[in-house]
């Protein structure tokens, strides 16, 4: 069977939304889902880049599988999301073939720069491993807000903290791909963080929750950026920077207080390379547990030799798409 990778035009994107509603339209009507997708696709990612939809077709023009690509780091790191195969085409390897074709296309496009493709799987690892992806540690800390007493959230450090109302207020925010010997970091761009907040505002409107004007909390050198997940009733930390456990506690205390005020029962923060591990039970004292993220397993496909021996560390929720 001869298969071809095809970039969808705007009309095809809308038609595909009607199909993928089955997979990602939970808690939404079809009309709401269609509005969500068109609004998120209209978001500006900078660099003249945008979200693109890719279709794997056979000779008859049937769409066998589809996905979207996101410009995480301009011409270096691409994110893959919304991989979808209709039930009648499942079990035939079409999603794997779609990603193989896409990886080949991006490899040819990368222009000799360190580059990679990332995704976050909600269907396990095997299907993506066959396309050349490998999984990395995917845990998160879940803080149960109703078990955190007000006393635990009091800040006794004297740190001057301010809420973030504009992401451009974050001084020294790192963006892009950073390589350090055998490790590398991928930082979500401010455009991607704004995409998360656009998503929050869409759900806030659908669920009559309004739109929050607070995007996180900062000190003179540290910050937490968060979003309110109305779909899963959680405050999610998108990006963070702190230099010790004292700063970490102060920032998280503010996140918990804000979640309580918004009626969110949980605060969730991704954990990679034991950045947060063990501190919650010792330094912090918050009611928390570390769990594997079965609905967003981080996976990466390296496109360039520069990163083959590297270890992807410090994964932030802000990279999710």
Region locations from a protein language model:
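Extreme N-terminal starter segment of soluble prokaryotic enzymes
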Residues: 1-3
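A short, well-structured alpha-helix characteristic of acyl/acetyltransferase catalytic modules
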Residues: 9-23, 163-188, 310-317
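Conserved beta-strand in the GNAT
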Residues: 51-57, 61-71, 77-84, 216-230, ...
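Active-site/acyl-donor-binding loops of N-acyltransferases
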Residues: 67, 120, 126-153, 227-321
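Conserved GNAT acetyl-CoA-binding A-motif
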Residues: 78, 99, 106-122, 261-272
């Amino acid at each position: 069977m001869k298969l071809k990778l095809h970039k969808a035009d705007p009309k095809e994107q809308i038609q595909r939304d009607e199909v993928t509603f089955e997979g990602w339209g939970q808690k939404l009507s079809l009309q709401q889902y269609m509005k969500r997708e068109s609004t998120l696709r209209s978001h500006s990612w900078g660099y003249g880049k945008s979200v693109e939809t890719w279709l794997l077709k056979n000779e008859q023009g049937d769409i066998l599988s589809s996905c979207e690509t996101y410009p995480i780091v301009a011409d270096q790191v691409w994110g893959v999301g919304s991989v979808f195969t209709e039930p009648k085409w499942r079990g035939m390897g079409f999603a794997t073939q779609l990603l193989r074709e896409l990886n080949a296309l991006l490899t040819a496009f990368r222009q000799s720069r360190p580059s990679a493709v990332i995704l976050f799987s909600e269907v396990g690892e095997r299907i993506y491993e066959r396309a050349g992806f490998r999984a990395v540690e995917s845990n998160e800390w879940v803080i149960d807000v109703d078990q955190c007493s007000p006393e635990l959230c009091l800040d006794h450090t004297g740190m001057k903290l301010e809420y973030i109302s504009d992401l451009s207020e974050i001084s020294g925010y790192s963006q892009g791909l950073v390589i350090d010997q055998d490790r590398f970091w991928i930082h979500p761009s401010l455009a991607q963080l704004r995409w998360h907040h656009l998503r929050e505002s869409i759900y806030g409107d659908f669920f009559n929750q309004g739109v929050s004007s607070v995007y996180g909390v900062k000190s003179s050198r540290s910050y937490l950026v968060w979003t309110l997940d109305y779909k899963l009733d959680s405050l999610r930390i998108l990006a963070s920077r702190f230099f010790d456990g004292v700063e970490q506690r102060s920032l998280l205390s503010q996140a918990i207080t804000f979640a309580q005020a918004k009626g969110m029962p949980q605060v969730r923060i991704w954990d990679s390379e034991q950045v947060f591990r063990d501190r919650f039970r010792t330094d912090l004292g918050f009611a928390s547990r570390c769990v594997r993220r079965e609905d967003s397993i981080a996976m990466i496909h390296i496109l360039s030799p520069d990163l083959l021996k590297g270890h992807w560390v410090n994964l932030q929720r802000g990279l999710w798409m």
